Every structure is written in structure tokens, then in C-alpha cells.
Amino acid sequence: MPTRRPHLFALLGAIVVLIPGAAIGSSVDVQVTSAIPMTEPQNDALQQSPSLSASVAALKSGLDALAANDIQRARQVREALPAKSLDRHILAWAIALYGGDQVPSGDIADAAKMLPNWPGTIALRKNSERALYRENPTPQIVVRAFDGSQPLTFEGVVILARSYVALGDTKAARSVLSPFWRTEKLEAGDEAAVIREFGALIPAADHRFRMERMFYADRVASALRVAGLAGAQQLADAWAAVSKGDKNAAKLLKAVPAAQRAAGYLFAEAEYLRKQQKFSDAAALVMKAPGDRDALVDADAWWVERRVLSRELVDQGDMKTAYRIVAAHAAESPANAAEAEFHAGWYALRGLNDPSTATKHFARIAELAQAPMSLSRAYYWLGRAAEVGGPGNAKDYFSRAASYGTTFYGQLAGERVGRQTLNIVYPSPSAGDRRNFATREAVSAIKRLQEAGYDRYAETLYRDLAGQLTSPGELALLAVLAERQGNHFMALKVGKIAGARGIDVGALSHPLGVIPDTANISGSGKALAYAIARQESEFNIGAVSSAGARGLLQLMPGTAKQLAKKAGMTFSQARLTTDAGYNATLGAAFLGEQLGRFDGSYVLTFAGYNAGPTRAAQWVAKYGDPRGKDVDAVVDWIERIPYTETRSYVQRVMENYEVYKMRISDKYDIVGDLVNGRG
């Protein structure tokens, strides 16, 4: 029966060749490829394509056909290309990655075998499963194709479970269905199809797990769809009423039978009480929750409820109960666990004046985290705890935090120990870096795809290399390759992806160049524009949000029109997404206005930019005015912002601003900027 393969299998997407089909250059029976090791490509086996200055007409014609959904033509072009040539590799990979109704599973499987080190193996695996579902071979072939591995798609689950049922192995069918059904978010039609075909086969306990999981994910309709099969209709009706804010929620909660009152019931009742602003009563229920993650069904959802409730209690002045709630968390993901430990440590230190207890929580963040953002926060707050009697040496902790100079807390720590500069040197590639980079097949493919005008496929390769390369020098070469194409968005992504892996990429994570000299912006204004643009659009000049915000600094057309009029400029909506200098000029003017609105406060301006100026003003009324306060009070004010997204946004833009000030003017002053704002 299917089993969970090691994590390596999932990550590298060991491709299962699903059925015989129109394979690349051959006819094959069912094949299985094992876990794919991420080794260096063997370039001696590759027949070099013509130089990049030569025509790429054949490759482009194949990619054009693919873009037009003419799969037959794309496959014909692929077959006409020289065997083992780079162009054939590129087109075979692109066809397999594209998938679609006309791409046989054999094509996908052969591409995976031919290109084991290329990106997108999980996507290829998923496309293979969908192709198998369409081709609908015999149950024996399906079972052999999956070779004991768990499907990754809805189609794969259905075809494999169906095959096991046809072969009389219902136990194996359940082993396929259960892990998928318990957690996967599905469209209503797919959900109904599973219930119709397999509803009676799936155990009631799995239906119950799914019901609760969907409620935790705020997918109420999905949860209600399986409530009957779960044998928990009364709980589902009550929980749905709580989620929707129905007036009869309390009555329905009371009517839930004792047999259905497990952890999910506690969650629904606690959520109801919180929404009724009965925070102490809600806290008492939350503290009754089991510590076992399996019993909680979704431990991370429980953490979110604890966080929201704890902040309400802090606002009520009950720091002690707030601490107890977050300290007893069972958050599962490392990111949520680190966030929970921060809340516990921060409440203990700043609310309860207990540096020893706070230190234990902050130290736990350092154990959980790998990313510079989290590590710098851990060491900074360990230093703060040590300053007021906690264990350890405050200066040592601050020095460790300061080594992460591109982060908010790293910069604060740097000023705490008297550092005048940030360590953001641009990586310098060695001769070895250049040799290694030049021999990578994926790099050659990027250049070829760019020459053919297909940057979207090239970007997949950029991202994959940014997630694999370990040398800052090679990563710098990759970013420069993108910049030379004018793709500042991808140059930034390279730095961000590598930086998130814990690689010291220096200035690579904060590149310059997207704002041209034609932009009418001062030096400090340019640093501010870069800081906002990095967060808002990630330097995607053509970005358009769902709300209609456009371009580098995500300006609304109406706002941009008013700004252009004030500046005596001709307004052009089209230029907002095509002319970075135009967008940046108007955006800098808008930022200047917002800074004026908040008396020069960067903190309030950034909070208002993200959540709206009205909310920023409301938070001033609720939490006090950070303007003119000492730096520790300003940091506390930022951490009190009730919106997680806005808290993070203020810190991210602030750290960006300091990095770009350093890069443009060779100085930074995060303490002065937090306390005094714009001078």
C-alpha cells in the first residue's frame, strides 16, 4: 500500500512515469524513477547548442507553439532538434512543465529522466498524475506506476484509490484517501466527487478530522459538507454559526452533545466568547485545550487564536493571563512556534518584568530559526533581557544580532554596541565562481530562453538556482544576469531567496538600479522610495494589485493623477506600469505628503501606508503617540500594532530604508529615524 516517502522524495519530486505514451524518441512501458539527487549537471554529455548569437528560431517556434497550446506542433519541433542539445532539453522541459490535456505522461516522465537536475520536478510529478487520470489505464498499470508512493494531486488520489478498489484492496485505497482527505483544500465539485465515490469507504474519524480542519481554515461550506459523514452535525452547525457571527451561536453551542465536545468544540466556544469581548472567559477555555497536536487537529490555528486573544488581554491590562496563554502554545510550524516564543518572551520581559523567564523563550527562537530576521530578533531580545538582569552578556547578544545588518533588530543591536556601518558589501565572485557558473546547464538555458524572449520560463530557472547555489559570488553573477535583462524583480528575488536560506549575500538582497536617474528624487527620498518599492512591488515595474494599485510603489491611479497635477506633470496611467522613474517620482511625492501628515514619523507613515492612515491614527489613540518617545518605547509601540502584517511591514520597510541609506549615502541611523523621524 502507499507509504509516505522520505522528505527528500517530496522535495525533489521523484517523478513517477505513469503509463506508456508518446515518449520522447521511444516507446516505453511503465517506468519508475527514484529520488533525484541534486548533483551537478554532466556537461560532457551535452551537445552544445549553437552560440547565443546564432538563430534561436527553432526553439522559439516550439515555445511559441506551446504558448498557443499547440502541443502537437511543439512536440514536432522538439523531435527535430538535435538529441542531447540544450535547445531540445529546454523544449522538452517546457512541454512537460506546461502539462495540459494533450501532453502524454510518457513525455513528462522522459523529460524528468533526461533532466533530473532541472527545476520543477514536483510540478512534473503532478502533471504526470493528471495525465494518468486522463489516460485511465488498467488498475494494475496505475498501481505499478505509483510504486507505493503517495499521490500529490486530487486526480492522482482518485485514480490510485479507484484502482485499489477495483483490485479488491480497500485497505490500500483508504491509505491513499485518508491523508489527502483529512487536510487537502478542494473545490466543491472535487469534494463532492470524493464523497460520492469514496464517502462510505473513508472512516468517520477521517471525515471528522477534515470537518474540523476546514473550520480552522475558515472553509465553512467545506466543513458542513462532511459534517453528516463525520457524525458531528450539531458541532458543525454551532461552529458555523460562530464563524459567521450568527445570533443563535450561543444556543447552538449549548445544544452540542457531550460526545462531540472535543478540542474543536472548545475552540468554537472560545472564539465565540472572544468575539463577545468576554476575554477572561475565553482564556479559561483556551487553557483547557489539550497539549497533544493530533487532538488539536490544527495546532497552528490554535496558536493564531491564542495570539489574537492574548493581545486583547494585553490591551485590557491582563499581561499575566496573556503570558500564560501564549506560553502554553503547541504551534507546529517553526515560524509559528518562533512567533509564539517571541510573544511569551516579550510579555514576560516588558509586561511582567521577568527577564529570566523571557530569556528562556527568546533562546528558543534561536533554536527554532534559521533566517536572519528571526535570529536577529532572538539575539536582540536576549540582549535586552540581559541588560535588566537576565542571564548572559548583553553586549555579546547584541553583537550577534548586529551581524545580521539587513534586519530591523540587527540594525537596532548594531547601534546598541556602537556600530557606525552596516555589513552589506556586494559579493565579489572569485575565478572559481565564474568557472562554475559558466558551466551550469541551467545558466546556459536561462540565456537561451531570454534570447528567445521567454523570460517566464527563465524565471523558473532563476528561482531554482537561487534556492540551490551556496556561493555568494555565484549568486551575485545570477543576479547580474537578471539585471542585464532589465529584470530587477528577479535580481531582487535571487537575493531574497538566498538570504532567507541564511546565506550572507550582503547588498545582493537590496539591489540598486530599478529607479533611474531620470526620477526627480533626492538622496534620502530615493532611499525611501527603494524601501517602499522593495516591499510593495519587489521591483516589478508592471505590477498591478487586485485593488488596482500600480507599478513600482503601487500607486492608485486616482492618487497618482492628483500628485501629477500638483507637481505640474502630465498624468499617464500607462506610464505607472512602464516607466519606473515616473512612478518613483510620483510615489516619492506621495510619501512626502504622508510623512507631513504624521509630522515626519516614519513609523506612523509606514503603518498608514500598509493599513491606512485612519487606522494608524486609531492606534495612536489606543497605544499612545510614539513620536518623540525613546527608542525602546517606539519598538514596543511597533510590536503593539494589532495587525501581524502591518507589524512586519513597518519593520521590513524600516530596515530597507536603513540599508538603502547606507548604500546611497554611506550612513544609517535607525534609532534617530525611529525616534525623530524625518528632520
What are these regions (language model features)?
Residues 69, 136, 168, 218, ...:
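Residue-level detector of the short coil/turn that links helix A to helix B
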Residues 44-52, 75-86, 97-100, 109-120, ...:
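Solenoid-like repeat scaffolds
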Residues 84, 93, 108-110, 114, ...:
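Catalytic glycan-binding domains that act on GlcNAc-containing polysaccharides
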Residues 65, 99, 132, 164, ...:
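Residue at a conserved register position within TPR or TPR-like alpha-solenoid repeats
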Residues 58, 88, 92, 108, ...:
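TPR repeat positional signature
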Residues 24-55:
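Compositionally biased, proline/threonine/alanine/serine-rich low-complexity intrinsically disordered stretches
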Residues 61, 92-95, 128, 160, ...:
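Structural register within alpha-helical repeat arrays
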